Every structure is written in structure tokens, then in C-alpha cells.
């Protein structure tokens, strides 16, 4: 029993000794799991790193492939390097230009390649810069670059001027093209683009310059011809007019007599009326010439008084009043003498004709309104307007100008009343003995 008792503890002790073995075996199972996890983590990290490095390698591959020719060296041929290269400083090698940075287009002995151009604002890039070609830039839509100012793009015009039509649209190299409707002359304030010059066919009938030159030449010739005719007529009329005036006034065409009478006061006011009367279709000069023809053998140039009155009776009846010249009786200043009579004209000229009369004399509507505002009363209005007329025209204001204006307005009665009043007041008289006939 003791042995069993001893064996029992021994067995239990044996179990105690052997017990940790299995526990240690069970506890050793997590040990291998930790390295596996680490292996998985490390493998994942390595995969990520390899993938990223692969991407970086792919991104850098193209520049490296493009840069590879840049570093390529070759020997110059007869001292020159091919396009896309420049010569080294020692002159032994040709060094490739850098893609996208500089270039060379021809065989050269440059120490450095040319820098690539960068497109400015307002331009678009058509093709990038390479080692053998510069960047190609073009103006944006709606703008163009002139040949004489390639540094900037200008806006195209939106339409053609009046009288012209559009025949060409806006391009990056030229503005819109306009031509005249009639002549087809090209109208452009700009220098024509190179494309327009190249595409012009040699079979064009006439250039715009030649057409415009022909038009200008014809216009100038027509203007010169018109001016020459006008000058000739004016000179001829000045020479003939004194003789016509002398014949119509009974002076026998003596220009000296006519000139002396034209220099007298108020004569220049009737020149226009005499010209109008001369140009009227009375056929008086022809009649005079017919009567004078039989008298040529006797050497008499003047008609007898009876014949002259008989032939000129219709014209004399119409122009008898116009030939009577009013002059101051006291040989005073004509304008000042006329001014002294203005106060009585309000009773002689109808009220409705006051403003039309002043307009005929040259006063503006504004001047008439000012004169009416300055007048002291209703009856003083015409006097104030006449004073303003005299102040405006000065020495050109004459009694004959006033009478002619009344005649033009159809106020013949008022004209006759003023003429009678000037004579009866003793301030004016008729020149050359006409006063007696007028007063009778």
C-alpha cells in the first residue's frame, strides 16, 4: 500500500513533470503565426513599393527616352552641326538641343540652341516646340496679326463702312476684306496680308490701285473743266455787263459812264435787279441791233429818241422805277439819313409784313425776338428791328435794299408810300434830274 501510495505521488509527480510539455507545445503554436503575419505585411509593403517604383519608372521613362538624344553627341561636318544640334565650345562635338526648351532649324555653328517661343496671352499654340522647330502660335478667333506689327494680335472689324460690302472673313493673318459696291476698289486701312498677295492671280483685269487712279484722274479733270468754264463765263460776263447796262440805261454802252454811276450811293443795291431785268426774255438787245444795222453806213451808233422809246417801251415801263436812285438831299451819310426816317415806317408798312420784311433784310429769328423784347411799345417794334438791321449790316444798309425787299414781298403800295415820304420830307431826292419827273 505504501508503494502504491508512493507510486501515486510519483505518478502524479510524473504527470506534473510531463504536464508542461503539452502546454508548451500548445503555447508554441502562436509563435509561428507572428512570423507569418509579419511576412504578409512585409510582402504587402514590398508590393506597394514595387508598384510605386514601377509607376515612377514609367513616368520618367519618356523624358529619359527623349532626353537620350539630347545628350547624343556627333562630330560636326565641315564645322557645322545638323538641325536640332549646336556645336560644343571646343568645336569637336555636336550637342543635341533640349526638347521643349531650345531648337535649331538649319545647319549651324551656334554654341547654343535658340530658346523656344512661348505663346502670349491672346494666342493659341498650334504645335509645340521641338529640337528642330520653334513653337507655332496663332491669334485667337476674332483677332489677327498684321505683317508690320507681329508682336500683338488686333481685333477684327465687325463690319464694313457704308457703301462697301464684305468679301473676305477675318483670319488669324488678316482683317475682314471690304470692297466698294460700284468700282470694286479694295478698301482697307491695313497693309494686305501675305496670303492675299500670294493668292492674287496674274490674270486679274485691273488692280485696285489702277482703278482708283483712273477714277481720281477723271474726277480731277471734270472739276478742272467745270472751274475753267465758270471762270471764262465770269470774265466774259464782267466785260459784257457794263455795255448791256449802258444800252438799257440809254448810255450807248459807255463803260466809263456806267462805272461812274455804279460808284454813286445806292447804285450797288440795284445791280442784281438790273441783271435780272437784262436776262428777262424781252429780246430788247436783238431789236436794238436790228435797228442799228441800217444806221451803220451813216456812222451813227445811237438810235433817235423816238425810235428808242418806241422799241424799249415795254421794258422801260417795267424798269423805270428801278433806275431812279435816291440819294440824301444834303449830301449827308445815306445810312444815317435813312435811320432818321425809321420812326415813320411803322405807319407805312402793314403790321403783318414787319417780320417777313426783316427776314428779307437778313435778320435771324432770334434777332427779331430780341428786338421785339427790347421795343418800348408795339409801335416801336419795327423801329427797333430796323435799327438792329443797320447795326448788323453797317454801310450795306441802304434805302434801295429796303425798297427792294418790300417789292419782293409784294408790298408795292408800302414801297411807294415810303419812297414818297422820303422825297416829301426833303431828306432824299432822285439822282440825275429824276426828282422832277417823280414829283410831277
From Swiss-Prot:
Its main location: membrane. Gene3D superfamilies: Death Domain, Fas, Tumor Necrosis Factor Receptor, subunit A, domain 2. One of its GO terms (cellular component) is plasma membrane. One of its GO terms (molecular function) is TRAIL receptor activity. The chain crosses the membrane at residues 211-231. Residues 339-422 form the Death domain. TNFR-Cys repeats lie at residues 57-94, 97-137, 138-178. It is found in: Membrane. Residues 1-55 form the signal peptide. The keyword Ribosomal protein does not apply. GO terms for biological process: activation of NF-kappaB-inducing kinase activity; apoptotic process; cell surface receptor signaling pathway; cellular response to mechanical stimulus; defense response to tumor cell; extrinsic apoptotic signaling pathway via death domain receptors; intrinsic apoptotic signaling pathway in response to endoplasmic reticulum stress; positive regulation of apoptotic process. PROSITE patterns: DEATH_DOMAIN, TNFR_NGFR_1, TNFR_NGFR_2. Keywords: Apoptosis, Disulfide bond, Glycoprotein, Membrane, Receptor, Repeat, Signal, Transmembrane, Transmembrane helix. Pfam families: Death, TNFR_c6. It is linked to Squamous cell carcinoma of the head and neck: A non-melanoma skin cancer affecting the head and neck. The hallmark of cutaneous SCC is malignant transformation of normal epidermal keratinocytes. Monomer. Can interact with TRADD and RIPK1. Interacts with HCMV protein UL141; this interaction prevents TNFRSF10B cell surface expression. Two TNFRSF10B monomers interact with a UL141 homodimer. Three TNFRSF10B molecules interact with TNFSF10 homotrimer. In the absence of stimulation, interacts with BIRC2, DDX3X and GSK3B. The interaction with BIRC2 and DDX3X is further enhanced upon receptor stimulation and accompanied by DDX3X and BIRC2 cleavage. This is Tumor necrosis factor receptor superfamily member 10B. The gene is TNFRSF10B.
Amino acid at each position: 500500500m505504501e508503494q502504491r501510495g508512493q507510486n501515486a505521488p510519483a505518478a502524479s509527480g510524473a504527470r506534473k513533470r510531463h504536464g508542461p510539455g503539452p502546454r508548451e507545445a500548445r503555447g508554441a503554436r502562436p509563435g509561428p503565426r507572428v512570423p507569418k503575419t509579419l511576412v504578409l505585411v512585409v510582402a504587402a509593403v514590398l508590393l506597394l513599393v514595387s508598384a510605386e517604383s514601377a509607376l515612377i519608372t514609367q513616368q520618367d521613362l519618356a523624358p529619359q527616352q527623349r532626353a537620350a538624344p539630347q545628350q547624343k553627341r556627333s562630330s560636326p561636318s565641315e564645322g557645322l552641326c545638323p538641325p536640332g544640334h549646336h556645336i560644343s565650345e571646343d568645336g569637336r562635338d555636336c550637342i543635341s538641343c533640349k526638347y521643349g526648351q531650345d531648337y535649331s532649324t538649319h545647319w549651324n555653328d551656334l554654341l547654343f540652341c535658340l530658346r523656344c517661343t512661348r505663346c502670349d496671352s491672346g494666342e493659341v499654340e498650334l504645335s509645340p516646340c521641338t529640337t528642330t522647330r520653334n513653337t507655332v502660335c496663332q491669334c485667337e478667333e476674332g483677332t489677327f496679326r498684321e505683317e508690320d506689327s507681329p508682336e500683338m494680335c488686333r481685333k477684327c472689324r465687325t463690319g464694313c463702312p457704308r457703301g462697301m460690302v464684305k468679301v473676305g472673313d477675318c483670319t488669324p493673318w488678316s482683317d475682314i476684306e471690304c470692297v466698294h459696291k460700284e468700282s470694286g476698289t479694295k478698301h482697307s486701312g491695313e497693309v494686305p496680308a501675305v496670303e492675299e498677295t500670294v493668292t492674287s492671280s496674274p490674270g486679274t483685269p485691273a488692280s485696285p490701285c489702277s482703278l482708283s487712279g483712273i477714277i481720281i484722274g477723271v474726277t480731277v479733270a471734270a472739276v478742272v473743266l467745270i472751274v475753267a468754264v465758270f471762270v471764262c463765263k465770269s470774265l466774259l460776263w464782267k466785260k459784257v455787263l457794263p455795255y448791256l447796262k449802258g444800252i438799257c440805261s440809254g448810255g450807248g454802252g459807255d463803260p466809263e459812264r456806267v462805272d461812274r454811276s455804279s460808284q454813286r450811293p445806292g447804285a450797288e443795291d440795284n445791280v442784281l435787279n438790273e441783271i435780272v431785268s437784262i436776262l428777262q426774255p424781252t429780246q430788247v438787245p436783238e431789236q436794238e441791233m436790228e435797228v442799228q444795222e441800217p444806221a451803220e453806213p451813216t456812222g451813227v451808233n445811237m438810235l433817235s429818241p423816238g425810235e428808242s422809246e418806241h422799241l424799249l417801251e415795254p421794258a422801260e415801263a417795267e424798269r423805270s422805277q428801278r433806275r431812279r436812285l435816291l440819294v440824301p438831299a444834303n449830301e449827308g451819310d445815306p445810312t444815317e439819313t435813312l435811320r432818321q426816317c425809321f420812326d415813320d415806317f411803322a405807319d407805312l408798312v402793314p403790321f403783318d409784313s414787319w417780320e417777313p420784311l426783316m427776314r428779307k433784310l437778313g435778320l435771324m429769328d432770334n434777332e427779331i425776338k430780341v428786338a421785339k423784347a427790347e421795343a418800348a411799345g408795339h409801335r416801336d417794334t419795327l423801329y427797333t428791328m430796323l435799327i438792329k438791321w443797320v447795326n448788323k449790316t453797317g454801310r450795306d444798309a441802304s434805302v434801295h435794299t429796303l425798297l427792294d425787299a418790300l417789292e419782293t414781298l409784294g408790298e408795292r403800295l408800302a414801297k411807294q408810300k415810303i419812297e414818297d415820304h422820303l422825297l416829301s420830307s426833303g431828306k432824299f431826292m432822285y439822282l440825275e434830274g429824276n426828282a422832277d419827273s417823280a414829283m410831277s
